[in-house]
Amino acid sequence: MNFLQPIGRTFFNALAGLGRLTLFAGSGFVNIVRPPYYPRLVLKQMVEIGFYSLPVVGLTAIFTGMVLALQSFTGFSRFSAESAIPNVVVVSITRELGPVLASLMVAGRIGAAMAAEIGTMRVTDQIDALTTLSTNPMRYLVAPRLLAGVTMVPILVLVADIVGVFGGYLLSIYKLGFNPSTYLHNTFDFLKVDDVVSGLVKAAVFGFLVALMGCYHGFHSKGGAQGVGTATTNAVVSASILILISDYVVTELFFSR
């Protein structure tokens, strides 16, 4: 029976970790709506998440749209169905690729930065100092980041949708020889509000998860510089996994009927 002990220990540790994460997320959500508020900190995080992430999100989106159009042309040309390319590009970008890829880029950039910053504050006792000064660390450090993540990632995804569809348009017009007006007509004819809304809902969920994992792993880091590095890695990996899992859940809610 000794071989069952590591399995049981791992299982209960996982449950304990899930419980801590759930309590942390609940506390962070409550502190978003409970005063005092820190608008300057929220604005700072919005700029960090939104404005400074635009280049990497834009580059990812435009080349994703171009590759998607090129790959679609390669497949559809065998069946003389090239006219379906605008439809495939706009649906794929708005429903899936825009929200998921933009959020993964944000997770790699912002999730790591949050974990490193808060983790450094933890190992250097700055968080304990905030508590000593009667400042709630959850309200001061975590809530502004969660609010900024929920607010700015949907905006980034909206930009990614536009840039990604534009990338597919550019490649289709200048390389594949599509008629510009026909391509735009097919794109707008097939674009549905539900597709955009589902992508933005996903983006809000993803933004919350990215900020949550960055704050959680940074908040619970220990062991000096090595611990901060581990927390940073764990934040990016866990945020990426949760993005993919929640992507399926939200897709099921929107499109299973």
For every predicted segment, state its role.
Residues 36, 45, 49-57, 92, ...:
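Loop-to-transmembrane-helix entry motif
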Residues 1-40, 217-218:
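Short, membrane-interfacial amphipathic segments enriched in basic
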Residues 47-101, 105:
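Active-site cofactor/substrate anionic-group-binding motifs, chiefly glycine-
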